[in-house]
Design a protein with these regions (language model features):
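Flexible, low-hydrophobicity surface segments
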Residues: 1-157, 171, 175-178
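Conserved beta-alpha junction segments in alpha/beta enzyme cores
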Residues: 35, 165-224
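Residue-level preference for nonpolar/small residues embedded in alpha-helices
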Residues: 63-64, 161, 212-213
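A broad structural signal for alpha-helix termini and local helix breaks/kinks
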Residues: 75, 224-225
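Predominantly extracellular/luminal regions of secreted and cell-surface proteins
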Residues: 80, 161-168
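Non-catalytic, substrate/partner-engaging modules appended to enzymatic cores
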Residues: 153, 158-160, 181-182, 187
């Protein structure tokens, strides 16, 4: 997403939302446990398999060994999908990493295997049996330390500046030069992190909860083409 021009007026500017009470459309259903979530469309897919993701234990490096033998032979397991047997996978424009890592690891917790089984519990149990060995590589994990030698992305122009900030700041009667930080924060969503996928002939339907629906659809199509 690129903002390179004024956004113009929006409902927040017109004060039609902020400062006024509004009922959530799905509020009552959520607090009473009747709101349908993405993975609950069982009327469209009555018999489903369950997938459980195995993620990378390192942030940067490569997989030297990925042993799925025990997982393959665990009760209820239908398949163990890795980069080695998944076939060609594309990469969407909005994704920063490939769908399945291997042998190269691009980030911590990158998906490196998907265990598919008849039940969720079987998939989860089998996922714990996947044995992975890594060759860890050095990386940069301190954002503040990396700032001095950071470079601007090539697709963006340099910031537009007006005046001489350094001189004005040095000559100001009162200055404030401080750094403020905040720890990582995670949204506590009520909806489980799960999606439902099913086929009607050659048409694939995905039921998922995603803020960027168009991006999700287009990138998924490019990944699976």
């Amino acid at each position: 997403m690129k903002f390179d021009k004024p956004a113009g007026q929006n409902p927040v500017d017109r004060l039609l939302v902020v400062g006024h009470p509004h009922d959530r459309i799905d509020g009552k259903r959520k607090v009473t446990g009747t709101a349908p979530y993405a993975w609950e469309w069982h009327d469209e897919a009555t018999k489903v398999a369950y997938g459980y993701i195995v993620t990378s234990a390192i942030a940067k490096g490569r997989i030297t060994s990925l042993d799925t033998h025990n997982a393959d032979n665990a009760p209820g397991v239908l398949a163990v999908v890795t980069a080695q047997n998944a076939g060609p996978l594309g990469k969407g424009e909005q994704n920063t990493a490939t769908l399945l890592g291997g042998p190269e690891i691009e980030h911590y917790h990158q998906a490196i295997a998907l265990v598919v089984a008849e039940t969720f519990e079987q998939a989860r149990a089998a996922a714990s049996l996947v044995q992975v060995q890594y060759e860890q590589q050095a990386g940069e994990y301190d954002l503040a330390a990396a700032i001095p030698h950071a470079t601007a992305p090539p697709e963006y122009e340099e910031d537009k500046t007006t005046g001489d900030f350094a001189s004005a700041f040095a000559g100001a009667a009162i200055t404030l030069d401080a750094t403020y930080t905040t720890p990582d924060q995670s949204h506590m969503a009520m909806e489980p992190h799960a999606s439902l996928a099913f086929w009607h002939g050659d048409q694939l339907t995905i039921r998922t909860s995603n803020q960027m629906i168009d991006w999700c659809r287009s990138d998924l199509a490019k990944t699976l083409k």
